[in-house]
């Protein structure tokens, strides 16, 4: 297999939206090969929270502008941007409270000091299965096959569909035959039961794409997050 490959994460488009200057072009300086896995973000609350559904969360936020809170792992993080996107589409003003990481946010949720948590499926699904969190919604286009009882955000707010992802890139200008060969190899790899199980263990679903589909995903996410940053006046770094 071609050895000069690197993983690109869903944080790439978000960093483009939140940073003032980049020393590279976020699209042209990467040779897209394929996405390899997607996994949803999860909106959840403590098991003891009176909020039972995502619709109830939105209703509470509408009734209490600026008082219903959501956590993230930092200003400008995907967690933060997703929460603000929900604010925009729902017409609410949930208060953003940033933390240094998921464990700190989790402690505040469990202590009742923050209303809702926006976190990766990797972290959230384990806490939901363990009975500590109640999943209100997943951000993916449809329900996760891993936890199908949790509704999608779009069931309440049509239009909000977002999945975290990992993808493979090579140097720009890599010959197309090499890119196509890599794409075929990753597609075969992702069809294996072993890889499907490994990804499932952290809330992910293996999904390959064409180089063009991966590029389009990145361009769309850059545009979306820039819009969120502009509308919510999030300070660029």
Listing of model-derived features with the role each one plays in the protein:
Residues 1-28, 67, 91-120, 127, ...:
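N-terminal (or domain-start) structured segment
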Residues 3-4, 17-104, 153, 158, ...:
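Hinge/capping helix and adjacent helix->loop/strand transition within the periplasmic-binding protein
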Residues 10, 47, 121-122, 140-141, ...:
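Short secondary-structure boundary segments
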Residues 31, 57, 132-144, 162:
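Conserved helix-loop-beta element of the AMP-binding
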Residues 53, 98, 112-113, 132, ...:
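Conserved functional loop/turn residues at catalytic and ligand-binding sites
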Residues 83, 109-110, 128-131, 182:
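Hydrophobic residues within well-ordered alpha-helices
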Residues 88, 129, 176-237:
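An extracytoplasmic/periplasmic, membrane-proximal ligand-sensing/linker region
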Residues 105-108, 145-149:
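Short, charged, surface-exposed secondary-structure boundary motifs
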